[in-house]
Each structure stands twice: as structure tokens, then as C-alpha cells.
């Protein structure tokens, strides 16, 4: 899971124990639920909190086969039990969503304690002019609203993966005994990714990247001389919007892949809805910085549930191993904000080359923001040289994908934001590098 640079900077500044974002060993990568209070507790809408069925349209042989494989991999007796086991990582993600309110209330309590250090005269001014205590109380109310959404996400995931409450409670109790806290940041980043992938507000960030990728795929489809759909793989797919856009083009058999269980249970939540409905989240209440007006921080964003494309298949797990046995299988691999998440960049390149058919194409769009412990960190010119040496041939892309980065080289640069909050008083953008290469 890619986290925002601001979140990463905050985590690094706070010390080595603050960054609890889910990582992996071989790679860094309905209606609005109603709520009310009863006796000071959150009363949950039973309709909103009930079990939500998976999309019945997704009943193709490949979906059924992958679900069977997934449940086999999820069995605690399958493979070695450790913190990298998919069931353990799933329980950790459910732990995180379970403790959303607790972790965020702890931070709010810290803000309230800090406010007590303000002098009486200063506090009187703050209360009169901006009603600062009410501001903190409003944040608490929105934490409770977000908790309802988190519980809906969790309920859907527990049904999909067949996890019962007793097993989750045992995992949480063990974590508590070991002194481990739930991962606050990964849950927060997942809520923000709902904005980037599915909310109207995320359209600006999507529109800076998607047109280049989609038009490139359209041109590849046009030159395809068979009626069979082109097999496309999108690793590091997050909450899946790009994969669904590719499927909507027609003529593609789309497979998306994601390691992060936080992202995967978020995707399952989106995918469980087959009607045009929506849920509202308040994703920006976990930080006080960079807000022009307080209502920007408090605003709710609607996440629409338009009917998902039933042909998209999610394969969970590590990109480098999830597709073992599928050598020379895919016509196209699309890496969108992905390759720099690698622990071992060369392993990603090897996997891309291994999975592509001879003559298959790799489309890349993204930055080179390496994580905290990569085995190798290459500059762009080094990447181009390595990729060519591995047996890839660069082909030019349209000007829609940006200007040429190097004279005489078929790689382009396009500015692309990655910040989630379009109203923030800060901007984080990259000169994303775009290329199209063919396996020769």
C-alpha cells in the first residue's frame, strides 16, 4: 500500500515505532450508515451493519476458481504461520478497523490535553472567537460517524473471508497481551484512498494519470488481430478504480492484484454493492494541518457504489509469487504508482518479464519514490538501461502522456498529484514517468 508522503514524513519524524503501515518482506506496495447516541454509546443501524452479500454477478469460472484458491491460502494451516501469513495480515487489518474509534479518540484526547496548556486569557479569546472546544467536540462526533463505516467494512470482510468474531477477538486479545496497538495509519490511508479512487473529489488525481494509460490500452487493442480479449494485469491496484476503468473499455480480461489487506477489504466493501448507492466518510479529521477553513477538515465525501464491473478479478497477495505457474500469460501489464514500492526492484522487473507473453507490453505510469529499506535504488536512466538489457524494447507513447524526459529516449514525464485532499493548503505532485515497452 502506498501512503501519502506527508503521512510518511510525519511517521519518520515521530520515530521508528510510529510507522505501523502494513509492509511486506519482499516489497515495501449502501447508503450512508445512520448513527445516533444512546446512553453515550453509538447505536448502529442494523440494516447498515448487517451482512452484505458479495456481487452475485461475479460467478465466472475464473472468479470461482480464484475464490477457492484464496480461501485455501487463507487457511491458518496452509503454509507457515507468521506475521506474513495472509490470514494473520487479514486479522491485523480487521484489528485496525475494529479499533478505529479507540485509536483516533486517543489522539483527540492528546489534543485536548495540549489545549489545557493555553493560558486562561488566550483560551477565553479562542473560545469566544472560534469556539475551539466545540471544534474538538465536532471531531469526536465525526470519529463516531467514521466508525460506523469502518464497522460496515469490517462486517463485509468477515463474511467474505469467513472470519468469526471469536477468532478476531482472540487475535485482538493476543495483540493486547503483546503490547501491540492497532495500525491507525493504514486505516486512515485506506479511507483516503476511497477518495482518490472512487469519490468525485478524487477525479483530478485520476484524470492526471488515467487518460494516458487508457488511451495507450485502446491503441494496443486496435492493433490486436484477434477477437479474444487481451489479458491485462494491474499489480498494486489499491481500491481498484483503474482496473474497473480498463474493463469498461471492453476487449480486456482484467486482473488486479494487491498485497495490502487494508486495501483488499476496502475493495471487497466496494465490490459487495451492486446498486447505485453511496456511503459518506470524513477522511480528513485525523490531522489539523493545511486546512484553509475548518469546514474543509470536517467535510464529508460521498463514495458512490455504482455497479462494479463483474469481469474484474482481484488476486490477493505478493505480485512476485501470486502468479506462479502463469508464465507468458498476460498480454499487458500496467504498473500505476507501483514499481517504486518494491523492496527489490529487480524482482519486479523479473516478474513482469516472466508473466508477459512474447510480444506483450508493459505500460508504466508513476514516480520513483523509494521506501525506507529497498535493496536497490535506481535512477531513471539506470532503469531504462536495465530494462533494455532484460529484453524489453521501448516504443513511443502519445503526447497525452507528457513531454519526452530525455532527448532520444522514448520515456515521457507527466505531472501527477498524489495527495487525496484537493482543498489542502499543500500540494504533493510528481513528474510521473511513463513508458511503453514490448517484450521481445
Positions of PLM-derived features:
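N-terminal accessory segments
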Residues: 2-226, 230
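Conserved class I S-adenosyl-L-methionine
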Residues: 225-238, 245, 253-258
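S-adenosyl-L-methionine
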Residues: 271-326
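Conserved Class I S-adenosyl-L-methionine
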Residues: 281, 285-286, 368-369, 373-404, ...
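A short acidic, Gly/Pro-enriched loop at the edge of an enzyme's catalytic core
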Residues: 320-333, 427
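A short glycine-rich, Lys/Arg-flanked "PGG" loop and its adjoining helix->strand segment in the class I
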Residues: 346-359
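Conserved beta-strand signature within the Rossmann-like core of class I S-adenosyl-L-methionine
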Residues: 359-371
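Core SAM-dependent methyltransferase catalytic element
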Residues: 390-391, 406-440
Amino acid at each position: 500500500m502506498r501512503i501519502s508522503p506527508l503521512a510518511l514524513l510525519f511517521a519518520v519524524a515521530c520515530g521508528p515505532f510510529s510507522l505501523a503501515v502494513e509492509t511486506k518482506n519482499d516489497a515495501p506496495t449502501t447508503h450512508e450508515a445512520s448513527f445516533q447516541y444512546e446512553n453515550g454509546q453509538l447505536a448502529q443501524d442494523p440494516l447498515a451493519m448487517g451482512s452484505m452479500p458479495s456481487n452475485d454477478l461475479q460467478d465466472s469460472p475464473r472468479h470461482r476458481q480464484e475464490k477457492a484458491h484464496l480461501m485455501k491460502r487463507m487457511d491458518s494451516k496452509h503454509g507457515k504461520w507468521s506475521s506474513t501469513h495472509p490470514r494473520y495480515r487479514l486479522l491485523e487489518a480487521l484489528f485496525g478497523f475494529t479499533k478505529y474509534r479507540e485509536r483516533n479518540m486517543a489522539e483527540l484526547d492528546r489534543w485536548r490535553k495540549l489545549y489545557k496548556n493555553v493560558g486562561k486569557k488566550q483560551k477565553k479569546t479562542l473560545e469566544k472567537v472560534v469556539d475551539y472546544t466545540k471544534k474538538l467536540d465536532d471531531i469526536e462526533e465525526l470519529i463516531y460517524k467514521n466508525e460506523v463505516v469502518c464497522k460496515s467494512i469490517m462486517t463485509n470482510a468477515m463474511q467474505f473471508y469467513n472470519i468469526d468474531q471469536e477468532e478476531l477477538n482472540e487475535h485482538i486479545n493476543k495483540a493486547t497481551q503483546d503490547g501491540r496497538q492497532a495500525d491507525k495509519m493504514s486505516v486512515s490511508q485506506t479511507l483516503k484512498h476511497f477518495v482518490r479512487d472512487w469519490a468525485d473529489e478524487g477525479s483530478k488525481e485520476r484524470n492526471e494519470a488515467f487518460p494516458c494509460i487508457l488511451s495507450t490500452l485502446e491503441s494496443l487493442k486496435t492493433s490486436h488481430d484477434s477477437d479474444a480479449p487481451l489479458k491485462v494485469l494491474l499489480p498494486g491496484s489499491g481500491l481498484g478504480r483503474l482496473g474497473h476503468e480498463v474493463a469498461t473499455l471492453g476487449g480486456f480480461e482484467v486482473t488486479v492484484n494487491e498485497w495490502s489487506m487494508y486495501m483488499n477489504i476496502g475493495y471487497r466493501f466496494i465490490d459487495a454493492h451492486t446498486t447505485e448507492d453511496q456511503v459518506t466518510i470524513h477522511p480528513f479529521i485525523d490531522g489539523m494541518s493545511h486546512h484553509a477553513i475548518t469546514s474543509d477538515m470536517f467535510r464529508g465525501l460521498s463514495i458512490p457504489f455504482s455497479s462494479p464491473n463483474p469481469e474484474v478479478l482481484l488476486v490477493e497477495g505478493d505480485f512476485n509469487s501470486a502468479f506462479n505457474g502463469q508464465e507468458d500469460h498476460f498480454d499487458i501489464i500496467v504498473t500505476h504508482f507501483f514499481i517504486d514500492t518494491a523492496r527489490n526492484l529487480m524482482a519486479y522487473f523479473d516478474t513482469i518479464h516472466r508473466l508477459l507473453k512474447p510480444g506483450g507490453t508493459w505500460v508504466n505510469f508513476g514516480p520513483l519514490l523509494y521506501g525506507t529499506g529497498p535493496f536497490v535504488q535506481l535512477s531513471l536512466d539506470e532503469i531504462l538501461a536495465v530494462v533494455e538489457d532484460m529484453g524489453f524494447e521501448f516504443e513511443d507513447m502519445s503526447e497525452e502522456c507528457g513531454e519526452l524526459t530525455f532527448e532520444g529516449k522514448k520515456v515521457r514525464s507527466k505531472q501527477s498529484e498524489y495527495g487525496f485532499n484537493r482543498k489542502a493548503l499543500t500540494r504533493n505532485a510528481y513528474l510521473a514517468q511513463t513508458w511503453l515497452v514490448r517484450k521481445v
